[in-house]
Regions:
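Conserved beta-strand-loop-alpha-helix junction that forms the acyl-donor binding cleft
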Residues: 89-92, 117-127, 144-148
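Acetyl-CoA-dependent GNAT
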Residues: 6, 10-83, 88-90, 101-103, ...
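Conserved G/P- and acidic residue-centered "switch" motifs that form tight phosphate/ATP-binding loops
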Residues: 64, 95-97, 112
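Conserved GNAT acetyl-CoA-binding A-motif
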Residues: 108-120
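Conserved active-site tyrosine of GNAT-family acetyltransferases
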Residues: 131, 136
Length: 162
């Protein structure tokens, strides 16, 4: 029996409850329960926050269920931020995280961004390995509630003074 195919597609309004459930479920799995106010707000305002030509949000759908997410939105200038790369536990290690990341990076390049930035908790060690494999460089390790690491990847050669 061949495994069920996974389709990556743009977020639709009807996806919001399933996306919220997936993201908050992954956060709870990694021990983040109380401090998710900003995440909940981002999820509630997702259709607005990821709208327009400079942003996007995608879901991975398998058998009618949402099993992964990823987003990109403007940060400043030609830098965008990779957001909400989350996978259901059953999909980790299948290559789906890489597929979602590649989808997001392709969008960032086509939208004219030169740098991709992200902030991710050190609890997500497996995801950090994916970022490093894909050319992200650690900028800073924060001593905040989320134990965040900040990463950046240069997408295209930047000419002239920095």
């Amino acid at each position: 029996v061949s495994p069920e195919p996974v389709r990556i597609r743009a977020l639709e309004p009807g996806d919001l409850p399933a996306v919220t459930e997936l993201v908050l479920g992954v956060l709870a799995e990694f021990g983040f329960t109380a401090k998710v106010g900003g995440v909940e707000r981002d999820l509630r305002e997702m259709l607005e926050r990821y709208a327009g030509a400079s942003a996007g949000f995608w879901v991975a759908e398998k058998g009618g269920a949402i099993v992964g997410t990823v987003g990109v939105r403007a940060k400043e200038g030609r830098t965008c931020e990779l957001k909400r790369l989350y996978l259901r536990s059953t999909e980790r290690g299948t290559g789906l995280g890489q597929r979602l990341y590649e989808h997001a990076e392709a969008f960032a390049r086509s939208a004219g961004y030169e740098r991709l930035w992200l902030e991710s908790s050190r609890r997500f060690a497996r995801a950090h390995r994916l970022y490093q494999r894909n050319g992200f460089v650690l900028l800073e390790s924060l001593d905040n509630d989320w134990e965040d690491d900040l990463y950046e990847k240069v997408l295209s050669p930047v000419t002239g003074p920095q």
